[in-house]
């Protein structure tokens, strides 16, 4: 899968990478410009669902704090979803779009994600689809905060490594708002995630009585990396995660 020419020029460090999913090259993503306010916009990538497999679902994914939508993980998961019949959309938050490294304040992150949700709901190729939102780490957390405030149009949420608390600070939970989300949720969490272990996520789900499903990546860290001694190829880990997300999304 090659990047659109404009993005390839803007981010040359990612331009040469290609991804294949289940032996089949996915269609190239389309580029969308989403207006956030009168002066600012962000770039989104739409990975179209494979013909003949379309599920009538869109999954919007926000990136984590230390990457952008062109990271290997984001491109791989979006391509995998599309190959399995899910329309996938990724996007840059304003700070990454503008070449900055420090995440924006909460309100600015949320307003950006809310604008992307609106764009997905009204896009001519997606507006008949049901919508799932989420993302990697921070991207998933911001999606959850937006859904907690106003979940209109959101059929479900997918969290790929939910940052329940800062590493080493299990008392500083970022979970109080989750009880305000009415839509079903899927937590994909590494068993040894320093931002929230399987046990910690399971406790939040139980104590807050969330309409949630937990899929644990055995031996996985916050990036779902597993130790070589476990004998599980990393590509297999990622493929399994993608399969779980698709299975859960199609069942909504």
Model-identified regions with their sequence ranges:
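Primarily recognizes the serine-hydrolase "nucleophile elbow" in alpha/beta-hydrolase
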Residues: 113-180
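Serine-hydrolase catalytic machinery in alpha/beta-hydrolase-like enzymes
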Residues: 32-130, 149, 224-232
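Short alpha-helix in the alpha/beta-hydrolase fold that links the catalytic acid
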Residues: 74, 174, 183, 196-205
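Catalytic active-site module of serine/aspartate enzymes centered on a nucleophile-bearing elbow/loop
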Residues: 229-252
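Catalytic histidine neighborhood in serine/cysteine hydrolases
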Residues: 208-225
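Acidic catalytic loop of the alpha/beta-hydrolase fold
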Residues: 192-195, 222-223
